[in-house]
Protein backbone atom coordinates (compact mmCIF):
# COMPACT_ATOMS: atom_id res chain seq x y z
CA UNK A 1 0.00 0.00 0.00
CA UNK A 2 1.49 3.27 -1.07
CA UNK A 3 1.27 6.10 1.39
CA UNK A 4 2.26 9.62 0.45
CA UNK A 5 5.03 10.93 2.63
CA UNK A 6 3.98 14.19 4.22
CA UNK A 7 5.95 15.96 6.92
CA UNK A 8 3.89 17.11 9.86
CA UNK A 9 3.93 20.64 11.22
CA UNK A 10 2.73 20.47 14.79
CA UNK A 11 0.89 23.46 16.19
CA UNK A 12 -2.25 23.51 18.27
CA UNK A 13 -4.26 26.59 17.50
CA UNK A 14 -7.49 27.95 18.91
CA UNK A 15 -9.79 30.48 17.35
CA UNK A 16 -12.22 32.88 18.97
CA UNK A 17 -15.00 33.57 16.47
CA UNK A 18 -15.89 37.23 16.47
CA UNK A 19 -19.19 38.13 14.88
CA UNK A 20 -19.85 41.48 16.54
CA UNK A 21 -17.87 44.24 14.91
CA UNK A 22 -17.67 47.94 15.74
CA UNK A 23 -15.83 50.00 13.18
CA UNK A 24 -15.51 53.77 13.01
CA UNK A 25 -13.75 55.67 10.25
CA UNK A 26 -13.19 52.42 8.37
CA UNK A 27 -11.02 53.02 5.29
CA UNK A 28 -12.27 51.26 2.17
CA UNK A 29 -11.44 53.76 -0.51
CA UNK A 30 -15.07 54.70 -1.12
CA UNK A 31 -16.51 58.16 -1.57
CA UNK A 32 -18.76 59.20 1.36
CA UNK A 33 -22.39 59.36 0.30
CA UNK A 34 -24.37 62.55 0.66
CA UNK A 35 -27.64 62.36 2.54
CA UNK A 36 -30.58 64.59 3.28
CA UNK A 37 -30.57 63.73 6.96
CA UNK A 38 -32.13 65.48 9.95
CA UNK A 39 -29.24 67.45 11.43
CA UNK A 40 -30.75 67.30 14.92
CA UNK A 41 -30.56 63.52 15.44
CA UNK A 42 -27.67 62.07 17.41
CA UNK A 43 -27.25 58.87 19.42
CA UNK A 44 -27.28 55.10 19.00
CA UNK A 45 -30.25 53.40 17.33
CA UNK A 46 -30.79 49.68 16.74
CA UNK A 47 -32.75 47.75 14.13
CA UNK A 48 -33.28 44.03 13.54
CA UNK A 49 -33.92 41.89 10.45
CA UNK A 50 -34.17 38.19 9.61
CA UNK A 51 -30.83 36.73 8.55
CA UNK A 52 -29.84 33.31 7.23
CA UNK A 53 -29.63 31.63 10.61
CA UNK A 54 -31.63 33.96 12.83
CA UNK A 55 -32.00 37.62 13.71
CA UNK A 56 -29.33 40.13 12.67
CA UNK A 57 -29.18 43.40 14.61
CA UNK A 58 -27.46 46.61 13.54
CA UNK A 59 -26.75 49.60 15.76
CA UNK A 60 -26.03 52.90 14.03
CA UNK A 61 -24.30 55.81 15.72
CA UNK A 62 -25.72 59.08 14.40
CA UNK A 63 -24.06 62.47 14.84
CA UNK A 64 -26.21 65.39 13.74
CA UNK A 65 -28.10 63.02 11.48
CA UNK A 66 -25.02 61.51 9.82
CA UNK A 67 -23.97 57.88 10.21
CA UNK A 68 -20.64 57.91 12.02
CA UNK A 69 -20.52 54.40 13.45
CA UNK A 70 -22.01 50.97 12.92
CA UNK A 71 -22.00 47.64 14.73
CA UNK A 72 -23.65 44.38 13.71
CA UNK A 73 -24.44 41.16 15.54
CA UNK A 74 -25.72 37.84 14.22
CA UNK A 75 -24.66 34.93 16.37
CA UNK A 76 -26.64 32.42 14.31
CA UNK A 77 -25.21 33.39 10.93
CA UNK A 78 -22.97 30.81 9.28
CA UNK A 79 -19.38 31.10 10.42
CA UNK A 80 -17.13 31.80 7.46
CA UNK A 81 -20.04 32.99 5.28
CA UNK A 82 -22.57 35.26 6.98
CA UNK A 83 -20.00 36.15 9.60
CA UNK A 84 -17.85 37.65 6.84
CA UNK A 85 -20.65 40.06 5.91
CA UNK A 86 -21.07 40.98 9.57
CA UNK A 87 -17.34 41.64 9.84
CA UNK A 88 -17.06 43.70 6.66
CA UNK A 89 -20.23 45.68 5.99
CA UNK A 90 -20.60 47.75 9.21
CA UNK A 91 -17.30 49.49 8.59
CA UNK A 92 -18.28 50.32 5.03
CA UNK A 93 -21.62 51.72 6.22
CA UNK A 94 -19.85 53.82 8.86
CA UNK A 95 -17.31 55.23 6.43
CA UNK A 96 -19.65 55.87 3.52
CA UNK A 97 -22.61 57.15 5.53
CA UNK A 98 -24.86 55.04 3.31
CA UNK A 99 -26.69 51.77 3.84
CA UNK A 100 -26.48 51.05 0.10
CA UNK A 101 -23.08 49.41 0.34
CA UNK A 102 -22.24 46.26 -1.60
CA UNK A 103 -23.06 42.96 0.05
CA UNK A 104 -20.58 40.12 0.40
CA UNK A 105 -20.63 37.62 -2.46
CA UNK A 106 -21.88 34.24 -1.26
CA UNK A 107 -23.54 35.76 1.82
CA UNK A 108 -26.51 37.38 0.12
CA UNK A 109 -29.11 36.68 2.81
CA UNK A 110 -26.97 38.02 5.65
CA UNK A 111 -25.90 41.02 3.57
CA UNK A 112 -29.52 41.89 2.85
CA UNK A 113 -30.41 41.47 6.52
CA UNK A 114 -27.68 43.93 7.54
CA UNK A 115 -29.05 46.54 5.15
CA UNK A 116 -32.62 45.94 6.31
CA UNK A 117 -31.61 46.13 9.97
CA UNK A 118 -29.73 49.36 9.29
CA UNK A 119 -32.84 50.77 7.63
CA UNK A 120 -34.87 49.74 10.68
CA UNK A 121 -32.36 51.55 12.91
CA UNK A 122 -32.83 54.73 10.89
CA UNK A 123 -36.59 54.37 11.17
CA UNK A 124 -36.20 53.99 14.94
CA UNK A 125 -34.33 57.31 14.89
CA UNK A 126 -37.26 58.93 13.14
CA UNK A 127 -35.37 59.21 9.87
CA UNK A 128 -36.24 58.12 6.34
CA UNK A 129 -33.99 55.19 5.28
CA UNK A 130 -34.36 56.21 1.63
CA UNK A 131 -32.31 59.32 2.42
CA UNK A 132 -29.38 57.03 3.30
CA UNK A 133 -29.40 54.87 0.17
CA UNK A 134 -27.16 57.01 -1.98
CA UNK A 135 -25.11 54.70 -4.15
CA UNK A 136 -21.57 54.38 -2.88
CA UNK A 137 -19.03 55.22 -5.55
CA UNK A 138 -15.89 53.16 -5.29
CA UNK A 139 -13.20 55.54 -6.43
CA UNK A 140 -10.42 53.34 -5.17
CA UNK A 141 -7.62 52.88 -7.64
CA UNK A 142 -4.81 50.43 -7.53
CA UNK A 143 -1.66 50.10 -9.57
CA UNK A 144 -0.53 46.93 -11.26
CA UNK A 145 1.74 44.95 -8.97
CA UNK A 146 4.16 42.06 -8.96
CA UNK A 147 4.64 39.66 -6.07
CA UNK A 148 7.36 37.02 -5.73
CA UNK A 149 6.79 33.80 -3.77
CA UNK A 150 8.03 30.25 -3.57
CA UNK A 151 4.50 28.88 -4.01
CA UNK A 152 1.33 30.49 -5.32
CA UNK A 153 -2.00 28.82 -4.55
CA UNK A 154 -5.13 29.60 -6.55
CA UNK A 155 -8.21 29.29 -4.34
CA UNK A 156 -8.72 29.76 -0.59
CA UNK A 157 -11.00 26.81 0.05
CA UNK A 158 -10.14 23.71 2.03
CA UNK A 159 -7.60 22.32 -0.45
CA UNK A 160 -5.93 25.67 -1.06
CA UNK A 161 -5.50 26.60 2.57
CA UNK A 162 -4.37 23.09 3.51
CA UNK A 163 -1.75 23.21 0.75
CA UNK A 164 -0.63 26.68 1.84
CA UNK A 165 -0.29 25.68 5.50
CA UNK A 166 1.75 22.63 4.51
CA UNK A 167 4.08 24.54 2.19
CA UNK A 168 4.52 27.36 4.70
CA UNK A 169 5.31 24.76 7.33
CA UNK A 170 8.20 23.68 5.13
CA UNK A 171 9.58 27.20 5.28
CA UNK A 172 8.29 28.38 1.91
CA UNK A 173 6.80 31.80 1.17
CA UNK A 174 3.20 31.30 0.04
CA UNK A 175 0.63 33.55 -1.64
CA UNK A 176 -3.04 32.57 -2.03
CA UNK A 177 -5.18 34.22 -4.71
CA UNK A 178 -8.93 34.10 -4.02
CA UNK A 179 -11.50 35.48 -6.46
CA UNK A 180 -14.13 36.10 -3.79
CA UNK A 181 -14.19 38.59 -0.92
CA UNK A 182 -14.04 35.79 1.63
CA UNK A 183 -12.31 32.44 1.99
CA UNK A 184 -14.03 29.07 1.97
CA UNK A 185 -15.27 28.33 -1.53
CA UNK A 186 -17.45 25.23 -1.55
CA UNK A 187 -15.61 23.85 1.48
CA UNK A 188 -17.28 26.26 3.91
CA UNK A 189 -20.65 24.89 2.76
CA UNK A 190 -19.78 21.28 3.61
CA UNK A 191 -22.23 20.02 6.20
CA UNK A 192 -21.32 16.44 7.03
CA UNK A 193 -17.79 15.51 7.97
CA UNK A 194 -14.64 13.74 6.80
CA UNK A 195 -14.27 10.07 5.95
CA UNK A 196 -11.19 8.38 7.39
CA UNK A 197 -10.47 4.68 7.63
CA UNK A 198 -9.15 2.90 10.70
CA UNK A 199 -8.80 5.77 13.16
CA UNK A 200 -8.53 5.72 16.93
CA UNK A 201 -11.87 7.54 17.09
CA UNK A 202 -13.65 4.69 15.34
CA UNK A 203 -12.41 2.38 18.08
CA UNK A 204 -14.40 4.42 20.61
CA UNK A 205 -17.58 3.02 19.02
CA UNK A 206 -19.17 -0.39 19.44
CA UNK A 207 -19.17 -2.28 16.16
CA UNK A 208 -22.64 -3.15 14.90
CA UNK A 209 -22.31 -2.82 11.14
CA UNK A 210 -21.81 -6.45 10.11
CA UNK A 211 -24.70 -6.21 7.66
CA UNK A 212 -23.06 -3.23 5.97
CA UNK A 213 -19.81 -5.11 5.38
CA UNK A 214 -21.65 -8.17 4.08
CA UNK A 215 -23.77 -6.01 1.77
CA UNK A 216 -20.68 -4.37 0.27
CA UNK A 217 -18.93 -7.68 -0.33
CA UNK A 218 -22.10 -9.02 -1.97
CA UNK A 219 -22.33 -5.94 -4.21
CA UNK A 220 -18.70 -6.35 -5.25
CA UNK A 221 -19.26 -9.99 -6.19
CA UNK A 222 -22.56 -9.52 -7.98
CA UNK A 223 -22.05 -6.22 -9.81
CA UNK A 224 -18.30 -5.76 -10.22
CA UNK A 225 -16.90 -9.24 -10.83
CA UNK A 226 -15.26 -7.96 -14.03
CA UNK A 227 -13.53 -5.04 -12.29
CA UNK A 228 -10.04 -6.18 -11.29
CA UNK A 229 -9.49 -3.44 -8.72
CA UNK A 230 -12.79 -4.00 -6.94
CA UNK A 231 -12.38 -7.79 -7.04
CA UNK A 232 -8.88 -7.59 -5.53
CA UNK A 233 -10.03 -5.19 -2.82
CA UNK A 234 -13.02 -7.39 -2.00
CA UNK A 235 -10.72 -10.40 -1.61
CA UNK A 236 -8.52 -8.49 0.84
CA UNK A 237 -11.50 -7.17 2.79
CA UNK A 238 -13.04 -10.66 2.96
CA UNK A 239 -9.84 -11.94 4.57
CA UNK A 240 -9.74 -9.00 6.99
CA UNK A 241 -13.40 -9.52 7.85
CA UNK A 242 -12.89 -13.22 8.55
CA UNK A 243 -9.92 -12.44 10.81
CA UNK A 244 -11.93 -9.81 12.69
CA UNK A 245 -14.85 -12.17 13.22
CA UNK A 246 -12.47 -14.73 14.67
CA UNK A 247 -11.05 -12.13 17.06
CA UNK A 248 -13.39 -9.09 17.22
CA UNK A 249 -11.15 -6.47 18.82
CA UNK A 250 -11.89 -2.78 18.40
CA UNK A 251 -13.97 -1.34 15.58
CA UNK A 252 -13.78 -3.03 12.20
CA UNK A 253 -12.61 -0.90 9.29
CA UNK A 254 -9.60 -0.83 7.01
CA UNK A 255 -7.99 1.27 4.33
CA UNK A 256 -9.01 -1.38 1.81
CA UNK A 257 -12.67 -1.32 2.89
CA UNK A 258 -12.69 2.46 2.50
CA UNK A 259 -11.15 1.99 -0.96
CA UNK A 260 -13.75 -0.62 -1.82
CA UNK A 261 -16.62 1.63 -0.74
CA UNK A 262 -15.15 4.53 -2.73
CA UNK A 263 -14.63 2.44 -5.87
CA UNK A 264 -18.14 0.95 -5.71
CA UNK A 265 -19.58 4.39 -5.02
CA UNK A 266 -17.75 5.69 -8.10
CA UNK A 267 -19.08 2.80 -10.21
CA UNK A 268 -15.58 1.47 -10.68
CA UNK A 269 -14.30 4.22 -12.97
CA UNK A 270 -12.21 6.00 -10.31
CA UNK A 271 -8.45 6.15 -10.72
CA UNK A 272 -7.38 3.32 -8.35
CA UNK A 273 -4.06 4.97 -7.52
CA UNK A 274 -5.77 8.18 -6.42
CA UNK A 275 -8.33 6.25 -4.38
CA UNK A 276 -5.55 4.31 -2.68
CA UNK A 277 -3.74 7.56 -1.87
CA UNK A 278 -6.91 9.14 -0.50
CA UNK A 279 -7.73 6.25 1.80
CA UNK A 280 -4.19 5.35 2.91
CA UNK A 281 -3.60 8.91 4.10
CA UNK A 282 -7.02 9.62 5.60
CA UNK A 283 -6.32 8.59 9.20
CA UNK A 284 -3.06 10.54 9.21
CA UNK A 285 -4.97 13.56 7.90
CA UNK A 286 -7.29 13.39 10.92
CA UNK A 287 -4.20 13.48 13.14
CA UNK A 288 -2.79 16.44 11.16
CA UNK A 289 -6.01 18.35 11.66
CA UNK A 290 -5.82 17.58 15.39
CA UNK A 291 -2.34 19.07 15.49
CA UNK A 292 -3.72 22.24 13.94
CA UNK A 293 -6.56 22.62 16.43
CA UNK A 294 -9.24 21.08 14.20
CA UNK A 295 -10.91 18.16 15.95
CA UNK A 296 -13.18 15.72 14.13
CA UNK A 297 -13.78 13.02 16.73
CA UNK A 298 -17.50 12.22 16.50
CA UNK A 299 -17.90 9.16 14.25
CA UNK A 300 -21.12 8.19 12.50
CA UNK A 301 -22.67 6.56 9.43
CA UNK A 302 -22.97 8.15 6.00
CA UNK A 303 -24.28 7.19 2.59
CA UNK A 304 -22.29 4.55 0.73
CA UNK A 305 -20.06 3.62 3.68
CA UNK A 306 -20.12 0.04 4.96
CA UNK A 307 -19.30 1.13 8.51
CA UNK A 308 -19.25 4.23 10.69
CA UNK A 309 -16.47 6.25 9.09
CA UNK A 310 -17.42 9.91 8.86
CA UNK A 311 -15.67 12.10 11.43
CA UNK A 312 -17.58 15.19 12.57
CA UNK A 313 -17.05 18.21 14.80
CA UNK A 314 -19.17 18.92 17.87
CA UNK A 315 -19.74 22.12 19.82
CA UNK A 316 -19.18 22.74 23.53
CA UNK A 317 -22.51 21.07 24.28
CA UNK A 318 -21.48 17.92 22.42
CA UNK A 319 -23.88 18.55 19.54
CA UNK A 320 -22.78 18.00 15.97
CA UNK A 321 -22.10 21.09 13.85
CA UNK A 322 -21.50 21.64 10.13
CA UNK A 323 -17.97 20.63 9.23
CA UNK A 324 -17.28 23.38 6.69
CA UNK A 325 -18.20 26.38 8.79
CA UNK A 326 -16.20 24.79 11.62
CA UNK A 327 -13.04 23.97 9.66
CA UNK A 328 -12.62 26.93 7.33
CA UNK A 329 -12.12 29.68 9.97
CA UNK A 330 -9.59 27.44 11.70
CA UNK A 331 -7.71 26.78 8.47
CA UNK A 332 -7.70 30.53 7.85
CA UNK A 333 -6.32 31.06 11.35
CA UNK A 334 -3.58 28.53 10.61
CA UNK A 335 -2.73 30.34 7.36
CA UNK A 336 -2.36 33.62 9.23
CA UNK A 337 -0.18 32.00 11.89
CA UNK A 338 2.00 30.46 9.17
CA UNK A 339 2.54 33.80 7.45
CA UNK A 340 0.62 32.97 4.28
CA UNK A 341 -0.18 36.09 2.22
CA UNK A 342 -3.91 36.06 1.37
CA UNK A 343 -5.10 38.18 -1.57
CA UNK A 344 -8.91 38.30 -1.67
CA UNK A 345 -10.98 39.72 -4.53
CA UNK A 346 -8.14 38.70 -6.81
CA UNK A 347 -9.16 36.48 -9.71
CA UNK A 348 -6.52 34.32 -11.38
CA UNK A 349 -6.75 34.54 -15.16
CA UNK A 350 -3.63 32.88 -16.54
CA UNK A 351 -0.93 30.41 -15.56
CA UNK A 352 2.48 31.77 -16.49
CA UNK A 353 4.96 29.39 -18.10
CA UNK A 354 8.60 29.52 -19.13
CA UNK A 355 10.16 28.50 -22.44
CA UNK A 356 10.08 24.85 -21.39
CA UNK A 357 6.38 24.88 -20.50
CA UNK A 358 6.91 24.83 -16.74
CA UNK A 359 4.48 26.77 -14.55
CA UNK A 360 6.27 29.79 -13.09
CA UNK A 361 3.47 31.92 -11.70
CA UNK A 362 -0.04 33.27 -12.11
CA UNK A 363 -1.52 36.44 -13.56
CA UNK A 364 -4.65 37.78 -11.86
CA UNK A 365 -7.03 40.73 -11.83
CA UNK A 366 -7.66 42.67 -8.62
CA UNK A 367 -10.89 44.21 -7.36
CA UNK A 368 -10.23 47.54 -9.08
CA UNK A 369 -9.14 46.00 -12.36
CA UNK A 370 -5.43 46.15 -11.61
CA UNK A 371 -3.19 43.37 -12.89
CA UNK A 372 -1.48 41.29 -10.23
CA UNK A 373 1.42 39.12 -11.32
CA UNK A 374 2.71 36.47 -8.93
CA UNK A 375 6.05 34.98 -9.89
CA UNK A 376 6.51 31.64 -8.17
CA UNK A 377 8.60 28.50 -8.30
CA UNK A 378 5.48 26.31 -8.06
CA UNK A 379 1.76 26.74 -8.72
CA UNK A 380 -1.03 24.90 -6.87
CA UNK A 381 -4.51 25.00 -8.39
CA UNK A 382 -7.24 24.61 -5.76
CA UNK A 383 -9.97 26.72 -7.31
CA UNK A 384 -12.77 24.17 -7.08
CA UNK A 385 -14.97 22.61 -9.72
CA UNK A 386 -17.62 24.19 -11.93
CA UNK A 387 -20.89 23.47 -10.14
CA UNK A 388 -21.91 27.15 -10.01
CA UNK A 389 -21.27 27.60 -13.74
CA UNK A 390 -24.56 26.18 -14.95
CA UNK A 391 -23.67 26.79 -18.60
CA UNK A 392 -20.59 24.62 -18.13
CA UNK A 393 -22.65 22.03 -16.24
CA UNK A 394 -25.15 21.81 -19.09
CA UNK A 395 -22.32 21.65 -21.64
CA UNK A 396 -21.09 18.41 -20.11
CA UNK A 397 -24.45 17.07 -18.89
CA UNK A 398 -27.41 18.59 -20.78
CA UNK A 399 -30.01 16.75 -18.70
CA UNK A 400 -29.14 18.94 -15.71
CA UNK A 401 -30.51 22.08 -17.33
CA UNK A 402 -32.78 23.89 -14.88
CA UNK A 403 -31.42 22.21 -11.74
CA UNK A 404 -30.57 24.39 -8.75
CA UNK A 405 -27.05 24.28 -7.33
CA UNK A 406 -25.62 24.10 -3.82
CA UNK A 407 -22.32 25.61 -4.98
CA UNK A 408 -20.68 28.86 -3.90
CA UNK A 409 -20.75 31.64 -6.54
CA UNK A 410 -17.02 31.48 -7.23
CA UNK A 411 -17.05 27.84 -8.31
CA UNK A 412 -16.89 28.63 -12.03
CA UNK A 413 -14.28 26.21 -13.40
CA UNK A 414 -11.63 28.88 -14.02
CA UNK A 415 -8.79 26.71 -12.76
CA UNK A 416 -9.67 23.93 -15.17
CA UNK A 417 -9.83 26.34 -18.10
CA UNK A 418 -6.53 28.03 -17.20
CA UNK A 419 -4.76 24.68 -16.98
CA UNK A 420 -6.28 23.47 -20.24
CA UNK A 421 -4.87 26.59 -21.89
CA UNK A 422 -1.34 25.36 -21.17
CA UNK A 423 -2.04 21.78 -22.25
CA UNK A 424 -3.45 20.09 -19.16
CA UNK A 425 -5.62 17.01 -19.61
CA UNK A 426 -9.02 16.53 -17.99
CA UNK A 427 -10.91 13.43 -16.98
CA UNK A 428 -14.55 12.52 -16.19
CA UNK A 429 -15.90 15.98 -17.04
CA UNK A 430 -19.39 14.58 -17.63
CA UNK A 431 -19.55 13.08 -14.15
CA UNK A 432 -21.60 15.61 -12.20
CA UNK A 433 -23.24 14.73 -8.91
CA UNK A 434 -26.66 15.79 -7.80
CA UNK A 435 -27.43 15.71 -4.08
CA UNK A 436 -30.83 14.39 -2.94
CA UNK A 437 -31.34 16.64 0.09
CA UNK A 438 -31.30 20.25 -1.06
CA UNK A 439 -33.87 22.48 0.68
CA UNK A 440 -36.57 22.96 -1.93
CA UNK A 441 -36.99 26.73 -1.57
CA UNK A 442 -33.51 28.08 -0.83
CA UNK A 443 -31.16 25.48 -2.38
CA UNK A 444 -29.45 25.17 1.02
CA UNK A 445 -27.66 21.86 1.46
CA UNK A 446 -29.28 19.62 4.08
CA UNK A 447 -26.62 17.38 5.58
CA UNK A 448 -26.50 13.72 4.67
CA UNK A 449 -25.50 13.10 8.26
CA UNK A 450 -29.15 13.25 9.32
CA UNK A 451 -29.91 10.14 7.32
CA UNK A 452 -26.87 8.47 8.81
CA UNK A 453 -28.19 9.40 12.25
CA UNK A 454 -31.59 7.85 11.56
CA UNK A 455 -33.70 10.21 9.41
CA UNK A 456 -35.86 8.82 6.62
CA UNK A 457 -37.25 10.13 3.32
CA UNK A 458 -40.99 10.23 2.64
CA UNK A 459 -42.76 10.82 -0.67
CA UNK A 460 -46.07 12.55 -1.39
CA UNK A 461 -47.89 9.29 -0.76
CA UNK A 462 -46.53 9.17 2.80
CA UNK A 463 -44.20 6.26 2.13
CA UNK A 464 -40.49 5.49 2.09
CA UNK A 465 -39.10 4.78 -1.38
CA UNK A 466 -35.37 3.99 -1.03
CA UNK A 467 -32.56 2.97 1.31
CA UNK A 468 -31.87 6.48 2.61
CA UNK A 469 -28.15 5.87 3.17
CA UNK A 470 -27.50 4.62 -0.33
CA UNK A 471 -25.13 6.52 -2.59
CA UNK A 472 -26.19 10.00 -3.64
CA UNK A 473 -26.74 9.11 -7.28
CA UNK A 474 -29.07 6.24 -6.40
CA UNK A 475 -31.05 8.20 -3.79
CA UNK A 476 -31.32 11.23 -6.09
CA UNK A 477 -32.59 9.14 -9.00
CA UNK A 478 -35.21 7.53 -6.77
CA UNK A 479 -36.31 10.92 -5.45
CA UNK A 480 -36.62 12.42 -8.92
CA UNK A 481 -38.86 9.50 -9.86
CA UNK A 482 -41.34 10.34 -7.08
CA UNK A 483 -44.46 12.45 -7.56
CA UNK A 484 -43.30 16.06 -7.90
CA UNK A 485 -39.62 14.97 -7.83
CA UNK A 486 -39.24 15.85 -4.15
CA UNK A 487 -39.45 14.22 -0.75
CA UNK A 488 -39.59 15.05 2.96
CA UNK A 489 -36.70 14.37 5.33
CA UNK A 490 -38.19 13.33 8.67
CA UNK A 491 -36.57 13.54 12.13
CA UNK A 492 -37.82 13.48 15.71
CA UNK A 493 -37.14 15.56 18.81
CA UNK A 494 -34.40 13.22 20.02
CA UNK A 495 -32.43 13.91 16.84
CA UNK A 496 -33.06 17.64 17.20
CA UNK A 497 -31.72 17.59 20.76
CA UNK A 498 -28.48 15.97 19.57
CA UNK A 499 -27.80 18.24 16.62
CA UNK A 500 -27.24 21.97 16.48
CA UNK A 501 -27.43 21.56 12.70
CA UNK A 502 -31.10 20.55 12.80
CA UNK A 503 -31.80 23.29 15.31
CA UNK A 504 -30.36 25.70 12.77
CA UNK A 505 -32.72 24.38 10.10
CA UNK A 506 -35.66 24.97 12.42
CA UNK A 507 -34.53 28.56 13.14
CA UNK A 508 -34.19 29.21 9.41
CA UNK A 509 -37.77 28.14 8.83
CA UNK A 510 -36.99 25.07 6.75
CA UNK A 511 -39.13 22.69 8.78
CA UNK A 512 -42.76 21.84 9.37
CA UNK A 513 -43.72 20.10 12.60
CA UNK A 514 -46.38 18.01 14.28
CA UNK A 515 -47.06 16.64 17.75
CA UNK A 516 -48.11 13.32 16.22
CA UNK A 517 -47.32 11.45 13.02
CA UNK A 518 -50.73 12.39 11.68
CA UNK A 519 -50.20 16.08 12.44
CA UNK A 520 -46.82 16.06 10.72
CA UNK A 521 -48.30 14.24 7.74
CA UNK A 522 -50.93 16.96 7.37
CA UNK A 523 -48.29 19.68 7.72
CA UNK A 524 -46.29 18.05 4.93
CA UNK A 525 -49.37 17.69 2.76
CA UNK A 526 -48.93 13.94 2.33
CA UNK A 527 -51.32 11.06 3.00
CA UNK A 528 -51.37 11.37 6.81
CA UNK A 529 -52.73 7.89 7.52
CA UNK A 530 -50.22 6.24 5.22
CA UNK A 531 -47.42 8.30 6.76
CA UNK A 532 -48.37 7.26 10.30
CA UNK A 533 -48.39 3.63 9.19
CA UNK A 534 -44.99 4.09 7.54
CA UNK A 535 -43.51 5.53 10.73
CA UNK A 536 -44.78 2.71 12.92
CA UNK A 537 -43.43 0.18 10.44
CA UNK A 538 -40.06 1.94 10.26
CA UNK A 539 -39.68 2.01 14.04
CA UNK A 540 -40.24 -1.74 14.02
CA UNK A 541 -37.53 -2.17 11.41
CA UNK A 542 -35.13 -0.16 13.58
CA UNK A 543 -35.83 -2.32 16.62
CA UNK A 544 -35.30 -5.47 14.54
CA UNK A 545 -32.29 -4.00 12.72
CA UNK A 546 -33.81 -5.25 9.48
CA UNK A 547 -35.35 -3.34 6.56
CA UNK A 548 -37.20 -5.86 4.36
CA UNK A 549 -38.48 -3.09 2.07
CA UNK A 550 -35.23 -1.53 0.84
CA UNK A 551 -32.39 -3.38 2.55
CA UNK A 552 -31.10 -0.49 4.65
CA UNK A 553 -28.35 -1.71 6.99
CA UNK A 554 -27.61 1.49 8.91
CA UNK A 555 -29.94 1.99 11.86
CA UNK A 556 -29.78 4.46 14.73
CA UNK A 557 -32.79 4.94 17.01
CA UNK A 558 -36.53 4.77 16.34
CA UNK A 559 -38.17 8.04 15.34
CA UNK A 560 -40.62 7.98 18.22
CA UNK A 561 -39.89 11.07 20.33
CA UNK A 562 -42.46 13.82 19.73
CA UNK A 563 -42.69 16.38 18.29
CA UNK A 564 -41.66 15.45 14.77
CA UNK A 565 -40.10 17.60 12.05
CA UNK A 566 -39.71 17.44 8.28
CA UNK A 567 -37.78 19.39 5.65
CA UNK A 568 -38.92 19.44 2.02
CA UNK A 569 -35.96 18.46 -0.15
CA UNK A 570 -35.17 17.94 -3.80
CA UNK A 571 -32.12 17.16 -5.93
CA UNK A 572 -29.58 19.82 -6.91
CA UNK A 573 -26.17 20.05 -8.59
CA UNK A 574 -23.62 19.48 -5.85
CA UNK A 575 -20.20 18.25 -6.98
CA UNK A 576 -18.29 17.93 -10.23
CA UNK A 577 -16.26 14.73 -10.12
CA UNK A 578 -14.39 15.60 -13.32
CA UNK A 579 -11.45 17.93 -13.56
CA UNK A 580 -7.73 18.08 -14.14
CA UNK A 581 -5.89 14.81 -14.51
CA UNK A 582 -3.29 14.38 -11.76
CA UNK A 583 -1.04 11.65 -10.42
CA UNK A 584 -0.77 10.56 -6.79
CA UNK A 585 1.76 13.34 -6.15
CA UNK A 586 -0.87 15.90 -7.32
CA UNK A 587 1.21 16.81 -10.39
CA UNK A 588 -1.00 17.92 -13.28
CA UNK A 589 -0.63 15.83 -16.43
CA UNK A 590 -0.88 16.84 -20.07
CA UNK A 591 -2.72 14.97 -22.83
CA UNK A 592 0.28 12.66 -23.29
CA UNK A 593 0.24 11.71 -19.62
CA UNK A 594 3.38 13.73 -18.94
CA UNK A 595 3.86 15.94 -15.89
CA UNK A 596 3.55 19.69 -16.44
CA UNK A 597 6.54 20.89 -14.40
CA UNK A 598 5.72 23.14 -11.47
CA UNK A 599 1.94 22.68 -11.69
CA UNK A 600 0.03 20.89 -8.94
CA UNK A 601 -3.69 20.58 -8.18
CA UNK A 602 -5.89 19.41 -5.33
CA UNK A 603 -9.56 19.28 -4.41
CA UNK A 604 -12.57 19.57 -6.68
CA UNK A 605 -10.53 21.13 -9.50
CA UNK A 606 -9.16 17.63 -10.11
CA UNK A 607 -10.80 14.53 -11.56
CA UNK A 608 -10.39 10.79 -11.13
CA UNK A 609 -10.66 10.50 -7.36
CA UNK A 610 -14.40 9.96 -7.11
CA UNK A 611 -15.28 8.34 -10.42
CA UNK A 612 -18.95 8.54 -11.37
CA UNK A 613 -20.21 9.46 -7.89
CA UNK A 614 -18.62 10.94 -4.77
CA UNK A 615 -19.42 9.49 -1.38
CA UNK A 616 -20.48 11.97 1.28
CA UNK A 617 -17.51 12.71 3.53
CA UNK A 618 -14.95 12.07 0.81
CA UNK A 619 -14.78 15.72 -0.31
CA UNK A 620 -13.31 16.85 3.02
CA UNK A 621 -11.00 13.84 2.97
CA UNK A 622 -10.04 14.77 -0.61
CA UNK A 623 -9.18 18.39 0.12
CA UNK A 624 -7.30 17.55 3.30
CA UNK A 625 -5.29 14.59 1.97
CA UNK A 626 -4.49 15.97 -1.47
CA UNK A 627 -4.13 19.53 -0.19
CA UNK A 628 -1.36 18.32 2.10
CA UNK A 629 0.27 16.32 -0.68
CA UNK A 630 0.10 19.29 -3.07
CA UNK A 631 1.60 21.63 -0.49
CA UNK A 632 4.43 19.22 0.25
CA UNK A 633 5.07 18.44 -3.42
CA UNK A 634 5.07 22.11 -4.40
CA UNK A 635 7.43 22.86 -1.52
CA UNK A 636 9.82 20.12 -2.63
CA UNK A 637 9.69 21.35 -6.22
CA UNK A 638 10.36 24.92 -5.11
CA UNK A 639 13.35 23.91 -2.98
State what each model feature region is.
Residues 141-159, 175:
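Beta1/beta-strand and adjacent pyrophosphate-binding region of the FAD-binding site
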Residues 253-370, 389-391, 542-561:
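Conserved redox-cofactor binding core of oxidoreductases
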Residues 418-425, 527, 532-535, 622-639:
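Internal hydrophobic alpha-helix adjacent to the cofactor/substrate pocket in enzyme cavities
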Residues 36-136:
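Active-site- and interface-proximal helix/loop "cap" or "latch" segments in soluble metabolic
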Residues 169-190, 207:
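Glycine-rich FAD pyrophosphate-binding loop
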Residues 220-234, 412, 416-420, 425-528:
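An anion/pyrophosphate-binding glycine-rich loop and adjacent beta-alpha core
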Residues 367-439, 626-629:
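Glycine-rich loop(s) and the adjacent beta-strand/alpha-helix scaffold that form part
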Residues 350, 530-613:
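A glycine-rich dinucleotide-binding beta-alpha-beta segment and adjacent secondary-structure elements
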